[in-house]
Amino acid sequence: MKRTFQPKKRHRARVHGFRARMSTSNGRKVLARRRQKGRKALSA
């Protein structure tokens, strides 16, 4: 059986990356929450 997670750097960045988060208002809210929480890494 094939595993479901087949990692690709480009897809990860495009879907979950910083610029993807910044491109929508809700994504900016995500980053704000993670900054407030004190996350070391804000996005993928």
Curated annotation (Swiss-Prot):
HAMAP family, A to Z: Ribosomal_bL34
Similarity comment: family membership: Belongs to the bacterial ribosomal protein bL34 family.
Gene Ontology annotations of biological process type: translation
Protein name (Swiss-Prot/TrEMBL): Large ribosomal subunit protein bL34
Top-level taxon of origin: Bacteria
Pfam families referenced in this protein's UniProt entry, alphabetically: Ribosomal_L34
Compositionally biased region (Basic residues): 30-44
A GO cellular component annotation in the UniProt record: ribonucleoprotein complex
PROSITE patterns for the chain: RIBOSOMAL_L34
Keywords for the protein's UniProt record, in alphabetical order: Ribonucleoprotein, Ribosomal protein
GO MF annotation, one: structural constituent of ribosome
Region (Disordered): 21-44
